[in-house]
């Protein structure tokens, strides 16, 4: 079923991909954002919980709602990015499990207070956010993930009255290499991993 991707594909996804701090003044069409989600949705999550919820912030009005929640260091680049994705997670994700995981009563595993679902929601929602970054790169987009923002303000502006909470943000577009910092090091296998 599977075969290894070639070196060029691995470079595009990982080795030469960079976290972008600046983007070209080139719009990202809504059809490409839909194509992006249609890739992301196939990424695995525990019991197919798929708790992530995505808001693609593209309009000036929506950016203005987001702006007060951004840290100073993330403000200008986010306002200039063609798209900012709010990666959220739905604490009531289990309500969809009769459809998403029909061969057993998985909904019952998560019935009870929302706090009991938080760990599964944020863990699997974070997975889906990572899939979004890789899917964006696979489609020729560049990404700049960020955690410097006030989650309570984002939740009030975009998720008020819902069971959805914000997790992190990702700027998307076509990267401007002029805004890149020098490539930073990564930990070696021996520093970060072991075989047990």
UniProtKB/Swiss-Prot annotation:
Cofactor: FMN
Organism: Stenotrophomonas maltophilia (strain R551-3)
Entry similarity comment: Belongs to the nitroreductase family. HadB/RutE subfamily.
Phylogenetic classification of the source organism: Bacteria, Pseudomonadati, Pseudomonadota, Gammaproteobacteria, Lysobacterales
Alphabetical UniProt keywords: Flavoprotein, FMN, NAD, NADP, Oxidoreductase
NCBIfam families assigned: PRK05365.1 (NF003768)
GO molecular function: oxidoreductase activity
Keyword Metal-binding attributed: no
Protein name: Putative NADH dehydrogenase/NAD(P)H nitroreductase Smal_0358
């Amino acid at each position: 079923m599977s075969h290894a991707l070639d070196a060029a594909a691995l470079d595009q996804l990982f080795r030469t991909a960079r976290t972008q701090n600046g983007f070209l003044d080139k719009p990202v069409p809504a059809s490409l954002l839909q194509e992006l989600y249609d890739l992301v949705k196939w990424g695995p999550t525990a019991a197919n919980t798929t708790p992530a919820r995505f808001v693609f912030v593209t309009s000036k009005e929506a950016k203005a709602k987001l702006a007060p929640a951004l840290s100073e260091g993330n403000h200008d680049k986010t306002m200039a990015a063609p798209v900012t994705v709010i990666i959220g997670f739905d604490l009531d994700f289990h309500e969809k499990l009769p459809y998403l995981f029909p061969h057993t009563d998985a909904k019952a595993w998560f019935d009870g207070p929302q706090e009991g679902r938080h760990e599964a929601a944020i863990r699997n929602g974070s997975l889906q956010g990572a899939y979004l970054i890789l899917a964006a790169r696979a489609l020729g987009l560049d990404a700049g993930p960020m955690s410097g923002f006030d989650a309570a303000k984002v939740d009030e502006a975009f998720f008020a009255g819902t069971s959805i909470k914000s997790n992190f943000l990702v700027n998307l577009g076509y990267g401007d290499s002029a805004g890149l910092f020098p490539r930073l090091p990564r930990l070696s296998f021996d520093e970060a991993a072991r075989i047990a």
